[in-house]
Design a protein with these regions (language model features):
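Flexible active-site lid/hinge loop adjacent to a nucleotide/diphosphate
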Residues: 1-66, 72-74, 85-89, 93-94, ...
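Short, Lys/Arg-enriched charge-dense amphipathic segments
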Residues: 2-5, 22-30, 70-80, 156-162, ...
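Short beta->alpha connector loops
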Residues: 4-6, 60-61, 78, 167-168, ...
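Short coil/turn connectors at secondary-structure junctions
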Residues: 13-16, 50-51, 68-70, 81, ...
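Residues that form or immediately flank small-molecule/cofactor binding pockets and catalytic motifs
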Residues: 59, 75-80, 97, 145, ...
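Beta-strand->loop->alpha-helix junctions that form or flank phosphate-binding loops
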Residues: 69-87, 137-141, 151, 190
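Nucleotide phosphate-binding/pyrophosphate-handling subdomain across enzymes
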Residues: 105-193
Length: 193
């Protein structure tokens, strides 16, 4: 379940497993500043206990500064981890207590884009201990994505059309554009937020 800053404001209970993939300015038409936005997003783990798990992306300059009340499990494409999911030489590894095991090649992830490698690593960290490595690999290699996120719409006259309308911030739009290796024509609209 993905929760927006609006849904998290005033949250009284935290899930046993929570994750924050990254934090970039968003919904600043509603929040007075980025700090207030971060406070709203971090409410997801504010009431966790020692037994709970928080998953953070260590490569994000904001999320790497956050602190867990319970067990911290991280992801990184830039460094090997003792506890978490990391990428090394295009292979995704899971590490627990300093012992690592190979999960899968990043190239086997069905959904395109570097940001989806992060998303898959986060998902693997979230379900670690609840799902087998085989199940994680099966999902990563078969899951085609969700509506409105680089969703293939159709091909007409050799042109492929994709819907990425959920990309409602510059960082999300850039991540989506970087998923394509071929020339892209972007049709965009909306308003500042």
């Amino acid at each position: 379940v993905e929760l927006s800053s609006f849904q998290l404001m005033g949250m009284k209970h935290s899930p046993h497993v929570a994750a924050i993939t990254n934090l970039t300015p968003n919904h600043l038409d509603y929040h007075k500043d980025f700090e207030e936005y971060v406070q709203a997003k971090t409410a997801i783990y504010r009431n966790q206990t020692e037994e709970d798990r928080l998953v953070l992306n260590l490569d994000d300059e904001v999320t790497r500064t956050l602190h867990a009340s319970g067990n911290l499990f991280c992801t990184s494409k830039k460094q090997e981890l003792a506890n978490g999911v990391f990428l090394k030489d295009d292979i995704i590894y899971i590490a627990e207590g300093g012992v690592r095991r190979e999960l899968m090649p990043a190239a086997d992830i069905r959904i395109p884009g570097a940001h989806n490698v992060y998303n898959m690593m986060m998902a693997a960290a979230i379900v670690q201990g609840y799902a087998s490595d085989d199940d994680i690999r099966a999902v990563a290699t078969t899951f085609g994505g969700v509506e409105h996120r680089i969703e293939f719409v159709r091909e007409k006259d050799g042109v492929k059309y994709y819907n990425d309308s959920i990309a409602s911030s510059p960082t999300r739009t850039i991540a989506g554009l970087e998923s394509f290796q071929q020339k892209v024509i972007l049709i965009a609209g909306g308003y500042d937020k």
